[in-house]
């Protein structure tokens, strides 16, 4: 069974940077050793947003973006290696999620697309890459997401305590870790995505630091109720979503009925939307003893305070309290999924994604001819 140092690379729906994590992994432990966040240049961020919001691109433009992102991921990995004084031979493999640009897991031809060419990562790092984790699950009838609940269960599951793990990235997702029950999990709806999109359009800021702007505003209840009436929130799990659905266009359609709304009031309402939509799902599943929060949204004091207020009797705290950095959780998960793939172990949970069976996930891009699975 493969064990040793792995690197996880994650570029999520928030587009707040490429997260890169170094970890020692074997069948008994996942020990994070180092991490960094690598910036995404503005022109790449724009290209990603254009695709996600349905703008037309030529195949040439898509191919260029795929190559450029692959090179960017390689730069981020090489920066971490240099920081830690490591050589490619010191790393077993890189687990790279890629950048999701479209996710449509339902219909006659379900599909998901992550770009960032793994061949370029191998070529520029000299390290084996495991990538393309989601499409096998979709081929087996699953949603292809979320995949991280399996990792949450491995690291944070408890034999007697009823726990949930909440990741608030661009999209928020919930993992239900209940004793003696199959793990479940799904996307609850928007996390940071709409808040970030609004403050970018209104103030040219990438995010609302410390929720300072949202705190200036007041929640517009009719707008909140209108947004919460979206069918996604009432849909049954398994379910997953992304920027192709909850985007600036979605927000504009809801704002059309509120032409005089104050910009900071809209921001306050979007923060409340995130907190309320999450808390509804926590309570719908019977609540828990501990809600462990990770992702960029765990650093939003307003959202965290509202979750605590909406969920009395539940301990709401970041995963940092359990010794796992909330900022690095997803990148760490994909390092672990790479280890699972090379060990010949399944990476998905059918109870989460709805797939017909558990399966080894991903495609392997070997750096050396000596690589063997399991």
Curated annotation (Swiss-Prot):
Keywords for this protein: ATP-binding, Carbohydrate metabolism, Kinase, Nucleotide-binding, Transferase
Catalytic reaction equation(s): 1,6-anhydro-N-acetyl-beta-muramate + ATP + H2O = N-acetyl-D-muramate 6-phosphate + ADP + H(+)
The enzyme's E.C. designation: 2.7.1.170
EC main group: transferase
Keyword Kinase: yes
Gene Ontology annotations of biological process type: 1,6-anhydro-N-acetyl-beta-muramic acid catabolic process; amino sugar metabolic process; peptidoglycan turnover
Annotated metabolic or biological route of this protein: Amino-sugar metabolism; 1,6-anhydro-N-acetylmuramate degradation; Cell wall biogenesis; peptidoglycan recycling
Pfam families given in the database record: AnmK
Positions contributing to ATP binding: 12-19
Keyword NADP: no
One MF term in the entry's GO annotations: kinase activity
Top-rank taxon: Bacteria
Function: Catalyzes the specific phosphorylation of 1,6-anhydro-N-acetylmuramic acid (anhMurNAc) with the simultaneous cleavage of the 1,6-anhydro ring, generating MurNAc-6-P. Is required for the utilization of anhMurNAc either imported from the medium or derived from its own cell wall murein, and thus plays a role in cell wall recycling.
Family: Belongs to the anhydro-N-acetylmuramic acid kinase family.
HAMAP family documented for this protein: AnhMurNAc_kinase
Name of this protein: Anhydro-N-acetylmuramic acid kinase
Lineage of the organism: Bacteria, Pseudomonadati, Pseudomonadota, Gammaproteobacteria, Enterobacterales
Gene coding for it: anmK
